Amino acid sequence: AGLPVIERGSLIVGADGRNSGLARAVGAPVYNHVPAILCYYFSYWSDVASETFELYVRTQQRRIIFSFKTEDELFAIFVGAPMDEFELFRRDVEGEFKRSLNLIPGFAERVRAGRRAERFYGCSDLPNFYRKPFGSGWALIGDAGLHKDPYLALGICDGLRDVEWLAEAIREGLGGARPLSDALADFETRRNEASAADYQENITAAKFAPLPPEFFALRAAVRDKPDEATRLMKARNRMIDPSDFFNPQNLQRLFAMTR
């Protein structure tokens, strides 16, 4: 190992995750905190006949299950369960994982036909919070400044959106257009306003709150239409722009097809 090197800058940006070392070092305040709601276990399988991405939610059994193809032709399969079942999972990870997959018989059968290529991994340290994203000489972005349960998979989209706004604020501040502290304060306001509704919706969804009757009617309309059913779940989970699916013209089209 070489000798330690000290680098200095007028502004240090921390994009170092929910357990940000920079946030800890500067004592960044936390607000709108909600303790971890779900824990997740996952592993990787080979030889699974699967779509590129699959998503299943079982509200009554309190499970979210999703899988996706990786670059090594493996499939990552995740199971999310409430924190009050975390110890149950820890005692029998493989058994609870299989019991969860069995809630979707067809999917479970395809997984059994494959081969698990790695050990199981788990994560329960998934609190929901905002951090003040700036101070004298520092700023935070991504999960370091705003972290949510992975349920709606919003983190990467929010991070990519927010980094554009942070870059704009830094450019204005360091470029002399206005005081850096003012630009960064506006960034915090902008970030919070843009994320507030999704933050609350994600918390509600992760608690497996009952869905409204309208959703069940819509799900019935797409039951025999796999492509539309996939679009519905992706729109609800912000994997595509919700307005591309939940617009009057598209909803009228779907309900008309069931008559």
Q: Residues of each region from the PLM?
A:
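Conserved FAD-binding catalytic core of PHBH/FMO-like flavoproteins
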Residues: 2-6, 11, 15-113, 117-119
